[in-house]
A protein has these predicted regions:
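Conserved C-terminal portion of the radical SAM core fold
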Residues: 67-77, 95-161, 168-198, 211, ...
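Short, amphipathic alpha-helical interaction segments positioned at domain boundaries
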Residues: 309-322
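Minor-groove-contacting beta-hairpin "wing" of winged helix-turn-helix DNA-binding domains
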Residues: 303-307
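Core AdoMet radical
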Residues: 10-23, 42-55, 71-80, 84-96, ...
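Single conserved hydrophobic/aromatic residue that forms the stacking wall/gate
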Residues: 1-9
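Nucleotide and nucleotide-moiety/phosphate-recognizing core
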Residues: 6-7, 25-31, 35-45
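Hydrophobic, secondary-structure "cap" segments at the distal end of domains
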Residues: 206-292, 298
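Glycine-rich anion/phosphate-binding loops
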Residues: 54-60, 126
């Protein structure tokens, strides 16, 4: 793959994710990054992110990682309330998270993101506010805040009937409170679940939401390139043998509309026309306009976008638009 793409396409971002790459340690992570830089055309000011969890980050050599080229940290903290961490099955403490952020900053990292979760069993508005305040006190530049989803084959799924889970109304209240509080602290919403200080929006994830191309490397990694979607299975043997599975095409009008509307800036009419060669159908604009009276959408002569309240029902509205 690197032989076919390395010299042709200049890569603007590199992202180490898909689990907990920090368990590899700084030496191996830097070796992999060096390999990527050697085989791919990575631009000089590329955003290079690595996901870490607060437990493995206690001992990782942040200085070495910063020196070899990593410049952004994404940390899966989830909550700043110890009881909620235990419910989630996380083994780190709040002190671990704080120490890890401080160590990363001391090493030179000034672009750090923390993940928060809403709708945790027994979580309250007050405990959510505590978690948000903790992130702000850490002076990180980016916060992602997601609503808990109960997936099959997870510990929560098996015992969900015994848990006090937030209902839809409580989840909505938490989401709107998070948006309001984060905004007051200088974290501006730029995507349905993502908030950043000015200039620190995730370039890597924004590329996904703008239907940009990306190459995924490793078991279970997905790619979108030259209009085609493909992926590696979970099998290490398949990956070692470069056995790819194809999902079909991507980047069509419906996908562009759906992904653009995840962004706070919304669906830009000019960008749609530039990409597809014709103007956005007027019925889409007209339909989106109908939801303005409910406080769900903002429709101008340039774009359609969702309000924070609208993001809560965006899936159903988008299904009507496309």
């Amino acid at each position: 793959m690197s032989r076919g793409l390395g010299d042709v396409y200049k890569r603007q971002t590199v992202y180490f994710g898909g689990g907990t790459p920090s368990v590899l340690g700084a030496d191996r992570l830097c070796d992999i990054l060096d390999f990527i830089k050697f085989n791919f055309n990575i631009q000089n000011n590329a955003e290079i992110t690595v996901e870490v969890n607060p437990d493995s980050a206690k001992t990782i050599d942040f200085e070495k990682m910063y020196a070899c080229g990593f410049n952004r940290i994404s940390m899966g903290m989830q909550t700043a309330v110890e009881d909620e961490l235990r419910l989630l099955g996380r083994i780190h403490s709040i002190d671990d998270a704080k120490t890890s952020v401080e160590r990363a900053k001391s090493a030179g990292f000034n672009n750090i993101s923390l993940d928060l979760m809403m709708g945790i069993p027994n979580q309250t508005i007050e405990s959510l506010e505590k978690s948000i305040s903790f992130c702000a006190d850490c002076k990180v530049t980016h916060i992602s805040s997601y609503i808990l989803k109960i997936e099959e084959n997870t510990p929560f799924y098996k015992v969900q009937n015994k848990l006090k889970l937030a209902d839809d109304d409580m989840q909505a209240e938490m989401y709107l409170k998070a948006v309001e509080m984060l905004d007051s602290l200088g974290y501006k919403q730029y995507e349905i679940s993502n908030f950043a200080k000015q200039g620190y929006e995730s370039r890597h994830n924004t590329n996904y939401w703008r239907c940009g191309e990306y190459i995924g490397i490793g078991p279970s990694a997905h790619s979108f390139f030259e209009g085609k979607r493909f992926f590696y299975s979970r099998s290490m043997d398949d990956f070692n043998n470069n056995k790819l599975s194809f999902e079909g095409t991507g980047g069509d009008e419906e996908e562009f509309i759906m992904l653009s509307l995840r962004l706070k800036s919304g669906l830009n009419y000019y960008e749609f026309e530039e990409k597809f060669g014709y103007t956005l159908p007027s019925y889409i604009i007209k339909k989106a306009k109908e939801y303005e009276k409910y406080g769900y959408t903002n429709v101008t002569d340039k774009s359609i976008s969702f309000t924070p309240k609208g993001f809560l029902v965006s899936n159903s509205i988008i299904s009507e638009l496309i």
